[in-house]
UniProtKB/Swiss-Prot annotation:
May play a role in the regulation of extra-urea cycle arginine metabolism and also in down-regulation of nitric oxide synthesis. Extrahepatic arginase functions to regulate L-arginine bioavailability to nitric oxid synthase (NOS). Arginine metabolism is a critical regulator of innate and adaptive immune responses. Seems to be involved in negative regulation of the survival capacity of activated T cells. May suppress inflammation-related signaling in asthmatic airway epithelium. May play a role in promoting prenatal immune suppression. Pfam families: Arginase. Its EC number is 3.5.3.1. PANTHER family: ARGINASE, ARGINASE-2, MITOCHONDRIAL. Residues 1-22 form a transit peptide. It comes from Bos taurus (Bovine). It is an enzyme of class 3 (hydrolase). This is Arginase-2, mitochondrial. It is found in: Mitochondrion. Mn(2+) 2 binds at residues 143, 145, 251, 253.
Amino acid sequence: MSLRSHLSRLLRTQVHSVRKKSVHSVAVIGAPFSQGQKRKGVEYGPAAVRXAGLMKRLSDLGCHLKDFGDLNFTPVPKDDLYNNLIVNPRSVGLANQELAEVVSRAVSGGYSCVTVGGDHSLAIGTISGHARHCPDLGVIWVDAHADINTPLTTSSGNLHGQPVSFLLRELQDKVPQLPGFSWIKPCISSPSIVYIGLRDVDPPEHFILKNYDIQYFSMRDIDRLGIQKVMEQTFDLLIGKRQRPIHLSFDIDAFDPTLAPATGTPVVGGLTYREGIYITEEIHSTGLLSALDLVEVNPRLAVSEEEAKATASLAVDVIASSFGQTREGGHIVYDQLPTPSSPDESESEERVRI
């Protein structure tokens, strides 16, 4: 291990040792929005993830919760294509503006903000709202796709494949002004984002990644390096020189479709359960997670109720492991074992037998 990597890991361990007994204050925002793409059903993602036990799981971890409920986005009655291609630009722009306000309120109130989508165009709003209070944030984008097409390079017209292009400062001379998007201010730079899990990248996106020096780890890189080394290098890049808030944007299609079948754009050869949860466990261990998106759960695309439940349950695992659930068992701090000399000796003995 390099000296830099060793020092970075040591610093993260020290931060974790200070914070490991702290209680997370977590705000949960449901974002039932589907107009960043054309497949219906992803608007039911928040309800599915809630039904899979999200709030109880976070509560059992000792989190102090504030539930903003599922947002009611303002409908746009007439939302014509932009440039005869881009789908629902006004709806996407307005929904993200509304979401950014709620995320901003949550972060300013001292909460770690969890947004459950909904499609990945919502990251425009979550990262914009987060950056208002944490302008130096770093983004870890876990996804099968880079989502960095511009409105001029996209072939699908779907804005859930373009959110990063609106957020990245270096791309602003390549991005036209879409109706409904005038409020957006680019808020991250190329060195402030790292991709993990890529395996379906369009040619223009690959050009952007290479020519704008954006760090990414494809599934081939994960196979070659191993997920531990990928996370070490990710942290070296984002927090190796200075500690700063982390925004984790996690698309459920980062996982292999055998694990997360109920999603709109599945791609074979994705993350295993162990790899995906290792990512979130390591992010939690930094003590720096400030906001998390969990997107693209689409229960309507499951071929069975079991597939829908499995995908939603996996989403809950991703979120819970980001806030302290471990595979050794997620526990509220247990400070002391009962002793035979305690007043409730018989009751303690019975508890130990159980």
